[in-house]
Amino acid sequence: MAETLAHRFTEFLLESNALKFGDFTLKSGRKSPYFINAGAFDDGKKIAALGAFYAEKISQAIVHNTIPRNIDTVFGPAYKGIPLAVSTAIALTAGHNMTVGYTFDRKEKKDHGDGGWMVGTPLTDGMKVLLVDDVMTAGTAVREVIPKLKAEANVEVVGLVLSVDRMEKTKDSDLSAVKAVEAEFGFPVLAIANVREIFDAAAKMKNADSAPLLSHDIQQRAAAYLEEYGA
Protein backbone atom coordinates (compact mmCIF):
# COMPACT_ATOMS: atom_id res chain seq x y z
CA MET A 1 0.00 0.00 0.00
CA ALA A 2 1.35 3.43 -0.96
CA GLU A 3 2.17 5.68 1.97
CA THR A 4 -0.18 8.61 2.44
CA LEU A 5 0.89 12.21 1.95
CA ALA A 6 0.62 12.74 5.72
CA HIS A 7 2.88 9.73 6.42
CA ARG A 8 5.52 10.86 3.93
CA PHE A 9 5.35 14.39 5.31
CA THR A 10 5.85 13.10 8.86
CA GLU A 11 8.98 11.25 7.71
CA PHE A 12 10.22 14.44 6.06
CA LEU A 13 9.61 16.50 9.21
CA LEU A 14 11.58 14.00 11.28
CA GLU A 15 14.44 13.73 8.77
CA SER A 16 14.66 17.53 8.68
CA ASN A 17 14.68 17.79 12.51
CA ALA A 18 11.61 19.99 12.18
CA LEU A 19 9.49 17.70 14.37
CA LYS A 20 10.53 16.96 17.93
CA PHE A 21 8.85 14.86 20.60
CA GLY A 22 9.39 15.62 24.28
CA ASP A 23 8.29 18.34 26.70
CA PHE A 24 7.80 21.83 25.27
CA THR A 25 6.16 25.01 26.53
CA LEU A 26 4.37 26.87 23.73
CA LYS A 27 3.81 30.64 23.46
CA SER A 28 0.26 30.00 24.68
CA GLY A 29 1.69 28.53 27.89
CA ARG A 30 0.42 25.05 27.04
CA LYS A 31 2.76 22.13 27.73
CA SER A 32 3.02 20.19 24.49
CA PRO A 33 4.49 16.71 23.84
CA TYR A 34 5.64 17.82 20.39
CA PHE A 35 7.11 20.86 18.69
CA ILE A 36 7.38 21.88 15.05
CA ASN A 37 10.30 24.15 14.15
CA ALA A 38 9.80 25.73 10.72
CA GLY A 39 13.30 27.20 11.02
CA ALA A 40 14.73 23.72 10.41
CA PHE A 41 14.03 24.06 6.66
CA ASP A 42 17.27 25.95 6.25
CA ASP A 43 18.77 24.82 2.95
CA GLY A 44 17.77 24.52 -0.70
CA LYS A 45 17.10 20.79 -0.60
CA LYS A 46 14.75 21.01 2.38
CA ILE A 47 12.83 24.06 1.20
CA ALA A 48 12.46 22.57 -2.29
CA ALA A 49 11.07 19.37 -0.77
CA LEU A 50 8.75 21.39 1.47
CA GLY A 51 7.45 23.33 -1.53
CA ALA A 52 6.80 20.04 -3.32
CA PHE A 53 4.65 18.83 -0.39
CA TYR A 54 2.63 22.05 -0.48
CA ALA A 55 2.20 21.70 -4.25
CA GLU A 56 1.05 18.09 -3.88
CA LYS A 57 -1.55 19.08 -1.28
CA ILE A 58 -2.75 21.92 -3.53
CA SER A 59 -2.96 19.55 -6.51
CA GLN A 60 -5.06 17.12 -4.46
CA ALA A 61 -7.36 19.96 -3.39
CA ILE A 62 -7.80 21.03 -7.02
CA VAL A 63 -8.73 17.47 -8.03
CA HIS A 64 -11.36 17.43 -5.27
CA ASN A 65 -12.63 20.90 -6.30
CA THR A 66 -11.80 22.32 -2.89
CA ILE A 67 -9.83 25.13 -4.50
CA PRO A 68 -9.84 26.27 -8.15
CA ARG A 69 -7.09 25.40 -10.61
CA ASN A 70 -6.78 28.91 -11.99
CA ILE A 71 -4.77 30.32 -9.07
CA ASP A 72 -3.03 33.55 -10.06
CA THR A 73 -0.52 33.83 -7.24
CA VAL A 74 0.62 32.08 -4.06
CA PHE A 75 0.89 34.52 -1.17
CA GLY A 76 3.14 33.98 1.86
CA PRO A 77 3.01 36.40 4.80
CA ALA A 78 6.40 37.78 5.84
CA TYR A 79 8.68 36.48 7.02
CA LYS A 80 8.22 32.73 7.34
CA GLY A 81 5.73 32.61 4.48
CA ILE A 82 8.17 34.04 1.94
CA PRO A 83 10.16 30.85 1.17
CA LEU A 84 6.91 28.87 1.32
CA ALA A 85 5.30 31.02 -1.39
CA VAL A 86 8.38 30.92 -3.63
CA SER A 87 9.07 27.18 -3.28
CA THR A 88 5.38 26.30 -3.71
CA ALA A 89 5.08 28.38 -6.89
CA ILE A 90 8.21 26.71 -8.28
CA ALA A 91 6.91 23.23 -7.40
CA LEU A 92 3.48 23.89 -8.94
CA THR A 93 5.18 24.99 -12.16
CA ALA A 94 7.81 22.25 -12.28
CA GLY A 95 5.73 19.33 -11.04
CA HIS A 96 2.11 20.14 -11.82
CA ASN A 97 2.23 22.17 -15.05
CA MET A 98 0.71 25.24 -13.39
CA THR A 99 2.01 28.72 -14.09
CA VAL A 100 1.44 30.74 -10.94
CA GLY A 101 3.02 33.80 -9.43
CA TYR A 102 4.28 34.37 -5.92
CA THR A 103 3.68 37.40 -3.71
CA PHE A 104 4.64 38.40 -0.19
CA ASP A 105 4.22 41.47 1.95
CA ARG A 106 6.71 43.78 3.56
CA LYS A 107 6.60 44.40 7.29
CA GLU A 108 7.09 48.10 6.56
CA LYS A 109 5.86 49.99 3.51
CA LYS A 110 8.60 51.00 1.07
CA ASP A 111 8.31 54.53 -0.33
CA HIS A 112 11.05 54.40 -2.98
CA GLY A 113 12.06 52.15 -5.87
CA ASP A 114 9.30 49.61 -6.56
CA GLY A 115 7.60 50.85 -3.37
CA GLY A 116 4.46 49.68 -1.64
CA TRP A 117 3.59 46.82 0.69
CA MET A 118 3.92 43.91 -1.75
CA VAL A 119 6.78 42.11 -3.49
CA GLY A 120 6.49 39.67 -6.41
CA THR A 121 3.48 39.27 -8.67
CA PRO A 122 1.46 42.50 -8.43
CA LEU A 123 -2.07 42.10 -7.07
CA THR A 124 -4.90 43.34 -9.30
CA ASP A 125 -8.68 43.26 -9.07
CA GLY A 126 -10.22 39.83 -9.63
CA MET A 127 -7.06 37.81 -9.01
CA LYS A 128 -7.36 34.46 -7.24
CA VAL A 129 -4.87 34.33 -4.37
CA LEU A 130 -3.90 31.20 -2.43
CA LEU A 131 -2.32 31.76 0.98
CA VAL A 132 0.41 29.52 2.41
CA ASP A 133 1.72 29.49 5.98
CA ASP A 134 3.38 27.02 8.33
CA VAL A 135 1.44 26.26 11.53
CA MET A 136 -1.63 28.16 12.68
CA THR A 137 -2.05 28.68 16.40
CA ALA A 138 -4.62 31.48 16.68
CA GLY A 139 -5.00 32.72 13.10
CA THR A 140 -3.46 36.11 13.93
CA ALA A 141 -1.27 36.23 10.81
CA VAL A 142 -4.26 35.60 8.53
CA ARG A 143 -6.34 38.29 10.19
CA GLU A 144 -3.48 40.75 9.75
CA VAL A 145 -2.79 39.94 6.11
CA ILE A 146 -6.33 39.84 4.68
CA PRO A 147 -6.87 43.62 5.12
CA LYS A 148 -3.47 44.24 3.49
CA LEU A 149 -4.46 42.15 0.48
CA LYS A 150 -7.86 43.83 0.18
CA ALA A 151 -6.26 47.28 0.47
CA GLU A 152 -3.97 46.43 -2.44
CA ALA A 153 -6.69 45.16 -4.81
CA ASN A 154 -10.09 43.48 -4.88
CA VAL A 155 -8.63 39.97 -4.91
CA GLU A 156 -10.37 36.69 -4.12
CA VAL A 157 -8.64 34.60 -1.46
CA VAL A 158 -9.44 31.03 -2.54
CA GLY A 159 -7.87 29.17 0.38
CA LEU A 160 -5.04 28.73 2.85
CA VAL A 161 -2.66 25.78 2.95
CA LEU A 162 -0.68 25.01 6.13
CA SER A 163 2.06 22.51 6.82
CA VAL A 164 0.42 21.20 10.02
CA ASP A 165 -3.02 21.59 11.60
CA ARG A 166 -2.53 21.39 15.37
CA MET A 167 -6.28 20.73 15.77
CA GLU A 168 -6.39 22.68 19.03
CA LYS A 169 -9.14 24.79 20.52
CA THR A 170 -8.41 28.49 20.64
CA LYS A 171 -8.40 30.22 24.03
CA ASP A 172 -11.85 31.73 23.60
CA SER A 173 -13.67 29.05 21.61
CA ASP A 174 -14.20 25.32 21.23
CA LEU A 175 -13.41 25.74 17.53
CA SER A 176 -9.90 25.09 16.28
CA ALA A 177 -8.02 28.05 14.80
CA VAL A 178 -8.51 26.45 11.37
CA LYS A 179 -12.28 26.12 11.75
CA ALA A 180 -12.54 29.63 13.22
CA VAL A 181 -10.72 31.14 10.22
CA GLU A 182 -12.86 29.14 7.79
CA ALA A 183 -16.01 30.38 9.51
CA GLU A 184 -14.83 33.99 9.61
CA PHE A 185 -13.50 34.33 6.06
CA GLY A 186 -15.37 31.66 4.11
CA PHE A 187 -12.43 30.00 2.36
CA PRO A 188 -11.07 26.49 2.98
CA VAL A 189 -8.05 25.98 5.25
CA LEU A 190 -6.12 22.82 4.43
CA ALA A 191 -3.04 21.19 5.94
CA ILE A 192 -0.52 18.76 4.51
CA ALA A 193 -1.00 16.78 7.73
CA ASN A 194 -2.85 17.22 11.00
CA VAL A 195 -1.42 16.36 14.39
CA ARG A 196 -3.43 13.14 14.74
CA GLU A 197 -2.12 11.91 11.38
CA ILE A 198 1.41 12.80 12.46
CA PHE A 199 1.15 10.86 15.72
CA ASP A 200 -0.48 7.91 13.94
CA ALA A 201 2.34 7.84 11.38
CA ALA A 202 5.12 8.29 13.95
CA ALA A 203 3.67 5.50 16.12
CA LYS A 204 4.38 3.06 13.27
CA MET A 205 7.99 4.18 12.80
CA LYS A 206 11.21 2.81 14.28
CA ASN A 207 14.34 4.65 15.32
CA ALA A 208 17.91 3.79 14.28
CA ASP A 209 17.99 1.00 16.89
CA SER A 210 14.79 -0.54 15.49
CA ALA A 211 12.92 0.46 18.64
CA PRO A 212 9.57 2.29 18.43
CA LEU A 213 10.12 5.95 17.60
CA LEU A 214 7.45 7.06 20.06
CA SER A 215 7.72 5.88 23.64
CA HIS A 216 4.59 4.73 25.44
CA ASP A 217 4.91 7.82 27.67
CA ILE A 218 4.91 10.22 24.70
CA GLN A 219 1.92 8.46 23.15
CA GLN A 220 0.00 8.72 26.43
CA ARG A 221 0.90 12.39 26.83
CA ALA A 222 -0.12 13.10 23.24
CA ALA A 223 -3.49 11.46 23.82
CA ALA A 224 -3.98 13.45 27.04
CA TYR A 225 -2.93 16.69 25.35
CA LEU A 226 -5.40 16.23 22.50
CA GLU A 227 -8.11 15.19 24.96
CA GLU A 228 -7.64 18.45 26.85
CA TYR A 229 -6.96 20.89 24.01
CA GLY A 230 -8.12 19.11 20.86
CA ALA A 231 -10.94 20.53 18.78
Swiss-Prot record:
Domain of life, per UniProt, equals Bacteria
Q: In which pathway does it act?
A: Pyrimidine metabolism; UMP biosynthesis via de novo pathway; UMP from orotate: step 1/2
Database matches in InterPro entries: OPRT, Or_phspho_trans_dom, PRibTrfase_dom, PRTase-like
Substrates-to-products reaction catalysed: orotidine 5'-phosphate + diphosphate = orotate + 5-phospho-alpha-D-ribose 1-diphosphate
* Keyword set includes Repeat: no
**One GO BP annotation of this record:** pyrimidine ribonucleoside biosynthetic process
Cofactors: Mg(2+)
Q: Which CDD domains match?
A: PRTases_typeI
Binding-site residues, 5-phospho-alpha-D-ribose 1-diphosphate: 27, 79-80, 106-107, 110, 112, 133-141
Q: Could you say which EC number(s) this protein's record lists? A: 2.4.2.10
Q: Does the keyword Glycosyltransferase apply?
A: yes
Please name the GO terms that the record assigns under molecular function: magnesium ion binding; orotate phosphoribosyltransferase activity
Query: Which of this chain's residues are annotated to bind orotate?
Result: 137, 166
Write the record's keywords in alphabetical order, separated by commas: Glycosyltransferase, Magnesium, Pyrimidine biosynthesis, Transferase
| NCBIfam families hit by this protein | pyrE
Entry function: Catalyzes the transfer of a ribosyl phosphate group from 5-phosphoribose 1-diphosphate to orotate, leading to the formation of orotidine monophosphate (OMP).
Q: Which family does it belong to?
A: Belongs to the purine/pyrimidine phosphoribosyltransferase family. PyrE subfamily.
> What's the subunit arrangement here?
Homodimer.
**HAMAP family named in the record:** PyrE (MF_01208)
Entry protein name? Orotate phosphoribosyltransferase
Give the species: Bifidobacterium longum (strain DJO10A)
